[in-house]
């Protein structure tokens, strides 16, 4: 059995500052006597600040718990800081930096939960988008992510381009 309960609020503090917050609890109970229950608090907080009509900044922090029916679970804490700027009426740019940590737990062995490796994750990216017409937009961007864990480290580069049409 898996249960999660969460309460939250969102709102505008002023015309330039808005945000949201959530607080919850998640629990996974198992029918097996060899697997003990897994539970944790889950939270998220977000703040958006409009500096002016062209520029805005955002910050999000999220703690998530993901149990599985087989006894594995992940508990992650992720943060993201972002900025957006409208260069012209039709061109917008954005950038972000993200960071996080993920802890993995294996199913219990001999009645006790076993901790596995954890990882730290970092990312950054930027994008540029243009509204070509009322129905067509185009965008491009670059994302880099770096995974740091005990079994090895690696980075990933992604370059993307897209055209979207609405009919």
Regions found by a protein language model. Name each.
Residues 3, 25-29, 61-67, 99-103, ...:
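Transmembrane beta-strands of outer-membrane beta-barrel pores
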Residues 3-7, 23, 41-45, 77-81, ...:
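Hydrophobic, lipid-facing positions within transmembrane beta-strands of outer-membrane proteins
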Residues 15-21, 53-59, 89-95, 130-140:
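Repeated loop/turn-to-beta-strand initiation elements of outer-membrane beta-barrel proteins
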Residues 28-34, 56, 66-72, 102-108, ...:
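Outer-membrane beta-barrel proteins
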Residues 90-125, 131:
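Outer-membrane beta-barrel transmembrane domain signature
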Residues 128-131, 137, 141, 155-167:
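Outer-membrane beta-barrel "beta-signal"
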């Amino acid at each position: 059995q898996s249960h999660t309960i969460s309460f939250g609020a969102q709102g505008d503090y002023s015309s330039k500052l808005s945000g949201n917050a959530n607080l919850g609890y998640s629990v996974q109970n198992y029918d097996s006597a060899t697997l003990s229950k897994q539970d944790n608090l889950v939270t998220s907080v977000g703040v958006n600040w409009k500096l002016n009509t062209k520029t805005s900044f955002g910050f999000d922090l999220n703690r998530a718990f993901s149990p599985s029916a087989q006894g594995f679970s992940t508990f992650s804490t992720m943060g993201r800081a972002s900025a957006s700027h409208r260069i012209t009426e039709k061109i917008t740019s954005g950038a972000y930096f993200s960071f996080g940590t993920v802890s993995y737990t294996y199913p219990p062995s001999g009645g006790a939960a076993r901790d596995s490796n954890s990882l730290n994750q970092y990312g950054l990216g930027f994008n540029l988008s243009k509204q070509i017409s009322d129905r067509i937009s185009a965008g491009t961007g670059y994302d880099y992510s770096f995974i740091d864990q005990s079994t090895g480290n690696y980075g990933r580069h992604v370059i993307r381009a897209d055209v979207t049409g609405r009919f």
